[in-house]
Amino acid sequence: MKALRWYGRKDVRYEDAPEPFPEAGQIKARIEYAGICGTDLREYASGPCMISPTKAPITLGHEFSGRVVQLGKGVKDFKIGDRVTGLGYWACGECYFCKRMQYNICLNQGFSGLTENGCMAEYMVAPHYAFYNLPGSVSYEYAALVEPLAVGLHAVRKSEMRPGDTVAIVGDGTIGLSVLLMALAAGAASVYIVSKHPGRAGIARKMGADAAIDPGKEDPVKQVQLLTGGLGADVTFECVGNPDTAQMAVDIARRDGIAVMIGVFDRAGPFHFADVVFGEKRIVGSSIYVREAEPVIALLADRRIDPGLLITSRVPLQEAVELGFEKLLKDKENNLKVLLKIPKKEDC
């Protein structure tokens, strides 16, 4: 089969790879679309980060849609031909956290496209519990967005946001805009986004943001205070993964407010806790998702959310490096979520 495989930094190849076979409890899916995530981009541009060099070559990708083509022994909750999407991680089911159904912080996690072969290929295999059935009303394109949308929903749930709350989001990537969609679906009264890319800020406004604040032109903390009568936001979300934007998210939150950290941080930084202490602010971590895939699929099926503006281009898998990874690195202004269309055998 054809696959997009990571060999090292700036070395990702479209090539032939062994076609996987499902073991007991696994499902084999024919992939329709795979999304390029910020994690994939980081591994391409500056990896290995989460990928072990000993795993190379490894097929990238954890955001996907497709259909079931083969069932491993013992799988009874799916059938051949089912349209599916799925999780990007696998849990052990045995550790302290798994026994408490906190699978997202499993001590022995495996990650599609990082520790195991992923979805940027004609076929992939994964444990049956990593798949979800799709209703006919959800397209393959939108289904490939379920994973990042689930990250957004999990963060909103962790924030304990209530209908009528004011929300501020620091970061204008796919996760930041997924949080925007989910906060609005959960009843946020106002949502402000801190965005340094005018193109992405425009997308955020079209998706429902009440204001987009450019940190290069104005102070986001002061601007949110102006917009909230001097209080600050009830809930803030950090979706960048930078110590400076983490501090910003805390500073934007009102007293007794909540700042949720979603971004993937690759370095430590100084942090001033005085405002947290005297303002009784709460800082909460949010890691991927647990039971959010099914609610996201329901929201898509009922058309209560429309993530179409997240998709800025669709490119063939064989052109993923130049038209996907490189474009995302060189032109963040006009590129957000790139979907890779997986070729059929006759196209290879």
Residue ranges and their predicted role:
Residues 1, 247-251, 290, 294-348:
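C-terminal hydrophobic helical "lid"/dimerization subdomain
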Residues 19-34, 48-96, 135-137:
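Glycine-rich beta-strand-centered segment in the early N-terminal region that forms part
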Residues 81, 164, 209, 232-233, ...:
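Local beta-strand N-terminus motif with an aromatic residue
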Residues 92-170:
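NAD(P)H dinucleotide-binding glycine-rich loop of Rossmann-like/cofactor-binding domains
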Residues 138-217, 222:
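Mid-domain Rossmann-like dinucleotide-binding core that forms the NAD(H)/NADP(H) cofactor-binding site
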Residues 159, 202-282, 343-348:
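Glycine-rich cofactor phosphate-binding loops and adjacent beta1-alpha1 units
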Residues 195, 263, 287:
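Conserved acidic E/D residue at the C-terminus of a beta-strand in Rossmann-like folds
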